[in-house]
């Protein structure tokens, strides 16, 4: 197939199927300096959302209470994984050797003056 045919097939497939935000979306060509982020929670949310690991759809995790209000855009970095090795690295850098992994993609908090609405 030519590049033009491959690009056309990709566009067609993207209309039929949704890429899994954890595995099917690139971290970005300029990573680690500039990364793609999948936003799960925006500051105005009264509900905590989370990507369902099996389907990739955004699901309701639990209601947000006043004590755990998220003041920034919060989400994940695609194609990353916080496993034992990552936890040890971060723990050593933070001076906290007791850190453990959570088996999820790496979290990200996005600081911006621009509004980012939900659009999954």
Model-predicted segments: where are they?
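Hydrophobic N-terminal alpha-helices or hydrophobic patches in metabolic proteins across all domains
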Residues: 1-120
């Amino acid at each position: 197939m030519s590049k033009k045919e491959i690009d056309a097939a990709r566009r067609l497939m993207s209309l039929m199927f949704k890429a899994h935000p954890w595995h099917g979306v690139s971290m970005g060509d300029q990573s680690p300096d500039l990364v793609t982020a999948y936003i799960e929670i925006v500051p105005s949310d009264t509900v905590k959302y989370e990507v369902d690991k099996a389907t990739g759809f955004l699901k309701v995790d639990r209601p947000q209470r006043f004590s755990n209000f998220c003041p920034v855009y919060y989400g994940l970095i695609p194609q990353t994984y916080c496993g034992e090795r990552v936890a040890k690295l971060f723990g050593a850098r933070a001076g906290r050797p007791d850190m453990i992994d959570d088996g999820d993609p790496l979290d990200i908090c996005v600081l911006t003056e621009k509004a980012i609405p939900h659009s999954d």
